[in-house]
Amino acid sequence: MNNYTIKDITRASGGFAMLAVDQREAMRLMFAAAGAKTPVADSVLTDFKVNAAKILSPYASAVLLDQQFCYRQAVEQNAVAKSCAMIVAADDFIPGNGIPVDNVVLDKKINAQAVKRDGAKALKLLVLWRSDEDAQQRLNMVKEFNELCHSNGLLSIIEPVVRPPRCGDKFDREQAIIDAAKELGDSGADLYKVEMPLYGKGARSDLLTASQRLNGHINMPWVILSSGVDEKLFPRAVRVAMEAGASGFLAGRAVWSSVIGLPDTELMLRDVSAPKLQRLGEIVDEMMAKRR
């Protein structure tokens, strides 16, 4: 059996410059907020995702697709560049309490062998972390996910995202990110996708300290995501996180959110989003070169 390794989803430098287009109801809300005709049809999301994969994947070491809206179509249309690995989301998002993702379970419909035949090299699992929910349940889900990936020769990418507790209103996001890393940072996955401390804001020295603290609890390669980070601050966030020990990024919003809802989508992705992704890839290579 062919077992993929981390090198299969990195750039030649050994760093990760990966594009996410697996946002689901959150992306629908973004289109609505940008003035798109509501209700926003599934086809609007599918078209955007497939276009983004076609136009941006040549500049990414991997692209993350979701089964709900775009994976099948991307495979059928050969949307992903040969030079870019494919990652498939194996999480089922459950909406509730007025938010698009209130709970997450491992998608039982995922067929690991079939996605591997289609060219996927990794699966990704979102793990919602709340201080007042059962840690063992999270660990069990990650263990089951890792087994699914590794028994099929696929890489396992986990994405712990912190949320306020179900009960009570005390929520320290920064501490929660650290606590989630303490719990899941040595859980046997191949890659840890994490929220940027401090939303990438403020003094560089503070960001570096927070990122170094995070690095101390993650016992596997890690990358940052861009949700919640101003896209203008994201390149700096990548630099600082990598200085602290991260190995790159797996991000969507910082690359393409500014073109959502604009006319001439393909043109916008080519002229606005592609240069952003190219630059981020250069930053990753630059930071990896400093490690040699």
Curated annotation (Swiss-Prot):
Family: Belongs to the aldolase LacD family.
Species assigned in the record: Salmonella typhimurium (strain LT2 / SGSC1412 / ATCC 700720)
SMART domains in UniProt: DeoC (SM01133)
Catalytic activity: 6-deoxy-6-sulfo-D-fructose 1-phosphate = (2S)-3-sulfolactaldehyde + dihydroxyacetone phosphate
This enzyme's EC code(s): 4.1.2.57
Subunit structure: Homotetramer.
UniProt-listed HAMAP family: SFP_aldolase (MF_01912)
Enzyme class: lyase
Keywords: Carbohydrate metabolism, Lyase, Schiff base
Protein name: Sulfofructosephosphate aldolase
